[in-house]
């Protein structure tokens, strides 16, 4: 036990308040392979030294409280306390620092994202000594990640189930998201799938409302995808949203989907909660269902640059909790997403091993070992003119989801789906032939539109759209 980190319990109990940094700021600490490491962006209140602010975060998210308590002497704080082991100034920002905190593995319940977040971010964000606090990244040690099942199936198993290789998968969110009857909803699904899409999708807020109860929607969508499969010879799917007000109701909906023989269900993992999500992911693996994850509510948590939590942390948490797809921004389109940062967390979702790279916002090297990967889903204000950029940015292991970019086609849903499928196949072929999608993308789409009237019509409709 190193002298600078040892907590003296043998000298007798002394009541009162002492500076956190005396116990929790340990710049000489060498991190262990089993530690969970966190990088916090800390903005202290005026007059609060950064060392005290970083130590306060370590204390309040592990063993500490606001005053010395006599029961500290009944345990080994040196074994269980979080430690702020390094602080660096954020370049270009006034009074802002990155505080690195190491947490001993024994602080966390095995296989529980819920417990991990309750400990690390559950209480400390309202701390008075801090003006703002943001969790930028976590390093999940192998010894902890191996206690999680992770995604129900992963990328390779999904491709094998669908028998689709060598290209991104194509999807579409059914619009209008609310108000359609179940039969009309199923008709929209059928038109999109027969036109060439791989998936259609319930919107995140489609659950079981008076205008369309969940069982009716499930039945009509199952009929639609079976009919489209028979016509096209391709395996099709519709993300049936199983999110519900209780875990029991959610599981009932997932069981119904399994009985209908559909390949995939869906969950809103932030509004539904990590406990519910992990339960559903376990059910999906045991019963051969793929699991699509929507990140509704994420911007409430991750959009502010100096407070909250970066989406890369939510992405890592989802991979641990379980999901085969997750929405990950687009870089292009209507929703915010910076290219390098987006690609950083896309790699954290898909790859087995990701090197530390601060230029992409990756603060720690992450080794997922054997945990399956998650397909990133690009959606939000995208259309056929974005296809070359999306194909280049996201690569084959992704889902490109065009809602309005399919259903807004002037000739209807099926021609909209045809336009997207033709554009995608043209981009993949051009890439495989060695053409530069970033430089020649528009020309590739124009060439393809010469032999696809559906694509030509789509190009005309969205030629002036700028997000």
Swiss-Prot record:
User: According to the UniProt entry, what is the EC number of this protein?
Assistant: 4.1.1.39
Q: Which InterPro entries match?
A: RuBisCO, RuBisCo_large_chain_AS, RuBisCO_lsu_C, RuBisCO_lsu_C_sf, RuBisCO_lsu_fd_N, RuBisCO_lsu_N_sf, RuBisCO_lsuI
Give the reactions, separated by semicolons, that this protein catalyses: 2 (2R)-3-phosphoglycerate + 2 H(+) = D-ribulose 1,5-bisphosphate + CO2 + H2O; D-ribulose 1,5-bisphosphate + O2 = 2-phosphoglycolate + (2R)-3-phosphoglycerate + 2 H(+)
UniProt-annotated catalytic positions: 175, 294
**GO MF entries:** magnesium ion binding; monooxygenase activity; ribulose-bisphosphate carboxylase activity
Q: Name one GO cellular component term.
A: chloroplast
Q: Which residues carry this modification: N6-carboxylysine?
A: 201
Q: Does the keyword Plastid apply?
A: yes
Say which domain of life the source belongs to: Eukaryota
- Determine if Repeat is one of this entry's keywords: no
UniProt keyword terms in alphabetical order:
Acetylation, Calvin cycle, Carbon dioxide fixation, Chloroplast, Disulfide bond, Lyase, Magnesium, Metal-binding, Methylation, Monooxygenase, Oxidoreductase, Photorespiration, Photosynthesis, Plastid
List positions binding substrate: 123, 173, 177, 295, 327, 379
Sites of N-acetylproline modification = 3
Q: What else is known?
A: The basic functional RuBisCO is composed of a large chain homodimer in a 'head-to-tail' conformation. In form I RuBisCO this homodimer is arranged in a barrel-like tetramer with the small subunits forming a tetrameric 'cap' on each end of the 'barrel'.
Subunit record text: Heterohexadecamer of 8 large chains and 8 small chains; disulfide-linked. The disulfide link is formed within the large subunit homodimers.
Q: What is this protein called?
A: Ribulose bisphosphate carboxylase large chain
Native source species: Phoenix reclinata
């Amino acid at each position: 036990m190193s002298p600078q980190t040892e907590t003296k319990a043998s000298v007798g109990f002394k009541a009162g308040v002492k500076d956190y940094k005396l116990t929790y700021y340990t710049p000489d600490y060498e991190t262990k392979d089993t530690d969970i490491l966190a990088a916090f962006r800390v903005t202290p209140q005026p007059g609060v030294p950064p060392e005290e602010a970083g130590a306060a975060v370590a204390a309040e998210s592990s063993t500490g409280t606001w005053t010395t308590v006599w029961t500290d002497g009944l345990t080994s704080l040196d074994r269980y306390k979080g430690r702020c082991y390094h602080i660096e100034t954020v370049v270009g920002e006034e009074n802002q620092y990155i505080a690195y905190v190491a947490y001993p593995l024994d602080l966390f319940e095995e296989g529980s994202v819920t417990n991990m977040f309750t400990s690390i971010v559950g209480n400390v964000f309202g701390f008075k000594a801090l003006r703002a606090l943001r969790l930028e990244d976590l390093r999940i040690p192998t010894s902890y990640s191996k206690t999680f099942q992770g995604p129900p199936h992963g990328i390779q198993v999904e491709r094998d189930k669908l028998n689709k290789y060598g290209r991104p998968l194509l999807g579409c969110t059914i619009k209008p998201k609310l108000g359609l009857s179940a039969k009309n909803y199923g008709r929209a699904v059928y038109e999109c799938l027969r036109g060439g899409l791989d998936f259609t999708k319930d919107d995140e807020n489609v659950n079981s409302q008076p205008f369309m109860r969940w069982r009716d929607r499930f039945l009509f969508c199952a009929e639609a995808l079976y009919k489209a499969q028979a016509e096209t010879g391709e395996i099709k799917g519709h993300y049936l949203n199983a999110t519900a007000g209780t875990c029991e109701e959610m599981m009932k909906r997932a069981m119904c989907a399994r009985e209908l023989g559909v390949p995939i269900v869906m969950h809103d993992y932030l509004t539904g909660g990590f406990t519910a999500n992990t339960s559903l992911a376990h059910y999906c693996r045991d019963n051969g269902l793929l699991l699509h994850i929507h990140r509704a509510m994420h911007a409430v948590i991750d959009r502010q640059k100096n407070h909250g939590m970066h989406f890369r942390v939510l992405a890592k948490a989802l991979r641990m909790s379980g999901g085969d797809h997750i929405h990950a921004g687009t870089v292009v389109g209507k929703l915010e997403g910076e290219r390098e940062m987006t690609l950083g967390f896309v790699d954290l979702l898909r790859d087995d091993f990701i090197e530390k790279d601060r230029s992409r916002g990756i603060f720690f090297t992450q080794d997922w070992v054997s945990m399956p990967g998650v397909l990133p889903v690009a959606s939000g204000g995208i259309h056929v003119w974005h296809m070359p950029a999306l194909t280049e940015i996201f690569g084959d292991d992704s889902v490109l989801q065009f809602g309005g970019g399919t259903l807004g086609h002037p000739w209807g849903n099926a021609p909209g789906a045809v336009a997207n499928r033709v554009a995608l196949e043209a981009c993949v072929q051009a890439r495989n032939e060695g053409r530069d999608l970033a430089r020649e993308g528009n020309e590739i789409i124009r060439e393809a539109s010469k032999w696809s009237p559906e694509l030509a019509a789509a190009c005309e409709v969205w030629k002036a759209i700028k997000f």
